[in-house]
Amino acid sequence: DWDAIRGAAVAALEHAYVPYSGYPVGAAALVDDGRIVSGCNVENASYGVTLCAECTMVGDLQMTGGGKLVAFMCINRDAETIMPCGRCRQLLYEHSAEGMTRDTVAGIRTIDQVLPNAFGPRDLEAVASRED
């Protein structure tokens, strides 16, 4: 339900801490058990430790029971769909169900289309299973 995911992202955006950029971001995702998790960006004077909205959303995922993300979106202050940075694409891949969909500036895409040829947990599991 993209409308419910967008609504959660809009609500999360309201909690963004952005005193430096003034660019709030909200993120939300549907989890494989039906929950919706969300997050907002949290800036820091030491820019390198700023948390993207996807990072706090994954924290919400883990704090509320874990699981795998099946559908995801992030938005700006105007509720326009925006793309995650490279680090966050990798973070999303780590916590995604196979084939996770996401709303992008080019329409609905899978995680594999947004981060092609990614390396993640499934690769490590494949190596471990060959060693057994």
Sequence positions of predicted segments:
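Short Gly/Pro-enriched turn/cap motifs at secondary-structure boundaries
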Residues: 17-20
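Short, well-ordered amphipathic alpha-helical segments that serve as non-catalytic structural scaffolds
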Residues: 8-11, 53-61
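Histidine- and/or cysteine-centered catalytic micro-motif in compact active-site loops
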Residues: 30-32, 41-42
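C-terminal binding/interaction regions
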Residues: 1-15, 64-132
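Compact, glycine-rich, soluble single-domain proteins
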Residues: 41-55
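Short beta-strand scaffold segments in enzyme catalytic cores
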Residues: 22-31
